[in-house]
Amino acid sequence: MISKKRLIQAVSVCALTAALAVGTLLVNSSCAEAVAGINELTGLATTAAESQRPIAVMIDNDKKANPHYGLSEADVVYEMINSTHNNRVTRLMAIYKDYNSVPRIGNIRSTRPTNIMLAAEYNAVLIHDGGPFYVYPYFDATGLNHLSGGFSRIANGKAREFTEYCVAGEAATRIAKAGYSTSYTAYEGQHFTFGANTLADDAGVATATNVSIPFPHNSTKFVYNASTMTYDFYEFGSGVKDGDDNVQVSFTNVFLQDCDFTLLDQNGYLVYNCIGTNVGYYLTGGLAIPVTWIKTTYTGLTKFYTLDGAELVVNPGKTYIALVPSDAWGSVSFK
């Protein structure tokens, strides 16, 4: 089992300094071009136009909201605590390049300040249903295009807050109606440098076939599936299956970021301090290595680096990213 203490001991000051220097250079570099036929979010082939910007959809992660629809087709999925109340309930943000091909996504819920800063990294159009008044300064600071509420209501026998979904074609229609561009308006290059990476020779490599993330509300876990070479997503004690086709939700890459937060009020609203630098883990192929992460501005890309300060090479495929509160980081475990 790997602990936060062991990781911090392994990360040298000069590794952090080197990574920060490289990261600042990358964030300030000129916009790169998307590559035709390649999904810049996964490094895999796509039929979507290379210039098509993604959508980021806020998805409820309360047990009552299950099953999730369209989650298995997301290119990148973020999970973070949505509130310090309700046993630190989490919420998901799923990012899709080829969103027109997904039958149904959701159910849709409100956004939080952190989601706005992260969605802005992708120049995505954020789909949500409202949010606390704390979100408005972040929309102003990022200039993020977003669509709030008014999506399809699908009767499922649940309370109204669990019935809103984005169905195929709806995102494109709403984007056009709002006058937003479907093409990138700002593209700072790929989040990840894709390439084959076994991690076998990396510093601090450890076995990671069974992973526990300290989100107490839903007990997020990942189990490495050697036959698919991906990590199967578990919560509430069961494998997460897509409500559309019952496919197990899984990811080639799993990132864990140690990230503290600021409590905004007594109602549990918060914002992660995701602009800065800290430690984390990268998991793929049943192994894990310690990394550092860096984000320098509201809209700047979060970049990941190995302990020697080199930009991390990430295996092509779908990616899950958890922002783990620093006060719980010591409870991250894998074996």
Question: Could you describe each region identified by the protein language model?
Answer:
Residues M1-K5:
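N-terminal secretory signal peptides that target proteins for export/translocation
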Residues L7-T24:
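Sec-dependent N-terminal signal peptides
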Residues V22-I38:
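Sec-dependent signal peptide cleavage junction
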Residues V35-Y78, S83-K335:
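A surface/extracellular/periplasmic glyco- and lipid-processing/surface-interacting theme
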